[in-house]
Structure formats: C-alpha cells, structure tokens
Amino acid sequence: MKTIIVFLSLLVLATKFGDANEGVNQEQMKEVIQNEFREDFLNEMAPMSLLQQLEAIESTLLEKEADRNSRQKRCLGENVPCGDFPCCGKLVCQKTFGYGWLYKSPYCVKPSNG
C-alpha cells in the first residue's frame, strides 16, 4: 500500500510540474523546429543547385559527345561508282567513257576543265 501511495504521489508531482513547464517547452520546441527547418531547407537548396549545375554540365557534355560520335556522311573517292552516295571533295559524279560502258553507272571523277 505504501508503494502505491509513493507512486501516485510521484505521478501527481510529475503531472503538476510537467504542465507548468509545458508552455516553455512548446516555445522551445517551436524554435528548435523552425531552426531545423531552416537548416534543412538551406541544406536541401545547396545540393539542388549543385544538382542543377551538374545536369547542365552533363547535358553540354552529352551534346559534344553526340557531335563527336556522329559521322559525317560517307563520300566516295575517285573512280568509284556513284549513285546514292555523294562524291568526296572536288569530285563530280559523271558518266565516263572508261568505266561507264562496262558497268553502266556514273563514276566519281575530277571535273574536266573545258
């Protein structure tokens, strides 16, 4: 019986003093929450801006890499049958006397001056 009375008196004292400090504790908790929120917000903003910077850098690098990996259109050299593919540089796709009569297709040749 004595132990029950001791526990009940401790319970009453804890409840009474706990309620007295509740207003102070709530204000402290609000301050702590606001400070944590501000710190979390700032901590989240820094990685977000870093993430955005990394994405911008990555997109420019991918564009450069895509340009580097893409080939120029293939072209045909001199004395090669042309048709669907263009001739390289200063060569012109013409029917010639030498090869044209055998294969019946135009060839990439140097343009004649005349």
Curated annotation (Swiss-Prot):
Q: Which residues form the propeptide?
A: 21-74
What is the protein's major site of localization?
secreted
Instruction: Check the UniProt entry and state the signal peptide residues, or none.
Output: 1-20
Keyword field contains Disulfide bond: yes
Keywords on this record? Cleavage on pair of basic residues, Disulfide bond, Ion channel impairing toxin, Knottin, Secreted, Signal, Toxin
Q: Where in the cell is it found?
A: Secreted
Q: Which residue pairs form cystines in this protein?
A: 75-88, 82-93, 87-108
Q: Does the keyword Electron transport apply?
A: no
Found, by tissue, as follows: Expressed by the venom gland.
* GO MF annotation terms: sodium channel inhibitor activity; toxin activity
Q: What does the similarity note say?
A: Belongs to the neurotoxin 14 (magi-1) family. 03 (ICK-30-40) subfamily.
Which function does this protein serve?
Ion channel inhibitor.
**Entry protein name:** U17-barytoxin-Tl1a
